Amino acid sequence: MAKVITFGEIMLRLATPGYLRFNQAKQFEATFGGGEANVAVSLANYGLEAEFVTRFPKNDIAESCIKDLHSYGVGTKHCVFGGERLGIYFLETGAVARPSKVVYDRAHSSIATIEKGMIDWEKVFEGADWFHWTGITPAISQGAADVCLEAIQAANRLGVKVSCDLNYRKNLWKYGKTASEVMPELVAGCDVILGNEEDAEKVFGIKPEGFDVTATHGEVNAAEFESVCTQLMAKFPRAQKVIITLRGSINANHNTWGGVLYSNGTLYQSPRYDITHIVDRVGGGDSFMGGLIYGLISYPEDDQKALNFAVAASCLKHTIYGDYNQVTVAEVENLMKGDGSGRVSR
């Protein structure tokens, strides 16, 4: 069984019930979520050994979060404790022409005050096959960025494959450095890079030539994105695979979804899914990443199948409430075979 380590921040998610706006809500629905933790949950669901690493405060909310992760089979034995609080994010789910809104309350969280040397990465990576991080973590604080680099360098030294989701969040970079300043050194240590057209442009100034996926409602011309992939590989020669997710947003409840994968001079394109009646798109990219890691580990000689698994897994996530993608390998494979009818399974 392959062992995957993920590192980042997990937060308390407080969502308005249904489609209520913040000013209408009299209560909030509490769950947990965070990019790297969401990936770990997906991988545990698929039967891999998944360990999530973070810094927790010592309080009952953190203990509840840990128990929640354990309930999905995610290990937390390498987590460290200290700091003041668990971060929080508030979610207002959009509908039709009204987009969803997220308000963060994560300043001074435990991971925001993490420092190099607090985590023994040599021990964390014992027996590990894969390490995953996202661009959200180095955006939190200089300390979080330093520890992320520390982890990547240890993984490289120990022969552990490294993946990243660029995941650019402009509102998080508040500690005096920009993503363009910090990310290149981190991404240079990655074997697999995932992003979208906005990530590539905002962080590295790389654009698809003459194509805007948002203007075409998700009609994907894969060749237009080959230039993004080749430019990323030229900038980061360690990378063996570059993957671009392609989301077309017709409205808040109706998206198109697909992706392309570039490796060894070949560009693979997934089927394009038309996702109507979205239940919850938060965690959609994380479910793609979880599916991709599983696919690349399970189908090492079949990049097309790995990509198709990632897209199908993420498509199913859009039907599930909460950050986590709670589906099985069999359910994903059924959708890959074309079984998207939604009929009762007996």
Kindly give the residue locations of the regions a language model identified.
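Conserved post-catalytic alpha-helical subdomain immediately downstream of the catalytic base
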Residues: 252, 268-339
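Positively charged, low-complexity intrinsically disordered leader regions
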Residues: 1-21
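Conserved N-terminal subdomain of the carbohydrate kinase-like
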Residues: 49-136, 332-346
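Hydrophobic beta-strand scaffold residues
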Residues: 50, 76, 162-163, 194
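Conserved phosphate/ATP/ADP-binding segment of small-molecule kinases
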Residues: 172-264
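Short catalytic helix/loop segments, enriched in acidic residues and glycine
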Residues: 21-40
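Alpha-helix C-terminal capping segments
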Residues: 38-49, 295-299
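A short helix->loop->beta-strand "cap" motif at the edges of active sites that frequently abuts
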Residues: 154-161, 236-240
